[in-house]
Amino acid sequence: MNNVFVYCEIDKFTVEEVSYELLTKGRKLANELGVQLEAIAAGNGITGKVEKEILSYGVDKLHVFDAEGLYPYTSNPHTSILVNLFKQEQPQICLMGATVIGRDLGPRVSSSLTSGLTADCTALEIGDYDDKKSGKHYDGLLYQIRPAFGGNIVATIVNPDHRPQMATVRSGVMKAEKVAEDYNGEVIYEDVAKFVPDTDYVVKVIERQVEKADNNLKGAPIIVAGGYGVGSKEGFDLLRKLAAELHGEVGASRAAVDAGYCEHALQIGQTGVTVRPKVYIACGISGAIQHVAGMKESGIVISINTDPEAPINQIADYVITGSVEEVVPKFIKYYKENSK
């Protein structure tokens, strides 16, 4: 009762990385609240394939739902699992990834339980809250932190009166860290029929087409990112050449995306992707806090900027003062001459 729950998203027999990130955060939240961490795994044929890995993130109790109709994912069965399990277990917090599945499942569950949900969170904390209108004081609420108004402000949202406190969290904003390979958690193999009525299986997935992503920003060891200072689409072509030489990926600031220099899929920051490369080369990026929030955990940051006072230089390990057009071709030339 009143524990922290994490819904683990599973693609066939593979637990998605965002779920491990949430288990890590869930463990920390549970420790702070003095409660247990529980996880939910639902799929087809997953018994014996996912339990040990999930438990290793510090899960005290894992609820496994294994049935033919639970994979590929469809809305109704998974909604019924969470709604009925939560009515039984009464969790105080539920976390899931801000993925295609999480954005479908989360609102359905929160609506059924009239609990409310904060979507696309970038941080989660535990804290107190004083309701000035009612005069009530609340201990140990979940601070659900997310960008608002196009990323221009950061909002902290609380849910004092309804449970569970639900949030979806963007992939990559939290680190996944195991507690112990042999963590001694309990596994409960649930009777799916008790939670899911037969009518929920009316929709079946006949065929799935999975398209390969155009980039791998989240997993790239080297990222060459461009900002408004790159100046044009042609400037981004230059960054792509450098990224290709370094076997890295190209990213962008919101200003560059808004200017039409590149596509939104490359955007890094609070309203884009969060990355942790070994090397981050910031080209013509001023360093707005919204952008820095998405790359601040990079290993080495190299800033190329005409403005020596640019905010990005405050967090950079190396600063090169100059234009992208002047500096990047020298990078490419030097690498070609010295990488053989």
Where do the model's predicted regions map?
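N-terminal glycine-rich FAD/FM-binding segment characteristic of electron-transfer flavoproteins
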Residues: 1-340
